Amino acid sequence: MGKIKAKWVSDKDWENIKKTIPTVCVDIIPFRNLQKSEKTLNLEIGLILRLAPLIKKWCFIGGRILKDETVYDAIHRQLRATLGINIKYSLEKDPQPVYVAQYFAKKTSYYGFDPRQHAVGLTYFLNIEGEAKPSGEALDFRWFNGNKMPLPTEFGFKQDRILTKILKLI
């Protein structure tokens, strides 16, 4: 589909939409230096520091899918807007998520938490190369050793739980 021209609704209409309909998003978990054996999994995972939504927390890269935008284009748009143009990655034209995350405005013990809305996050695990330059909502970007991640309280949206589930699938 190529470039997408954003189709915006008024702030008031968007707030009403979020109150009645779940938002579909892409969540991207960058990784590098993956080494896997029968007993161990070594890798680095990239996270952005952002206001989530009001406190600085480590989070996945992502955001909503725009009307008439393919998942491929949404992933590309989010990565470029958040990490800049000097990153490289390989992505199929019709990418399939490694996990489907659910976020609710009410805290639960199991699902993700987003006080702003009910959202469904199509989660992608992408091998990223090149120099990431945080921009947009990213206040910072950092590579973490997969065995030394931030504390659960330092993650936004309860994404530490989602990441734990995904790492068990790999």
Predicted regions and their residues:
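NUDIX/MutT-family hydrolases
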Residues: 121-127, 133-169
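Active-site segment of metal-dependent pyrophosphate-handling enzymes
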Residues: 84-131
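Acidic, metal-coordinating catalytic segment for phosphate/diphosphate chemistry
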Residues: 1-37, 114
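Residue-level signal for short segments within beta-strands and strand-turn junctions
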Residues: 30-32, 49, 128, 145
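A structural signal for short, well-ordered beta-strand segments
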Residues: 28, 75, 124-126
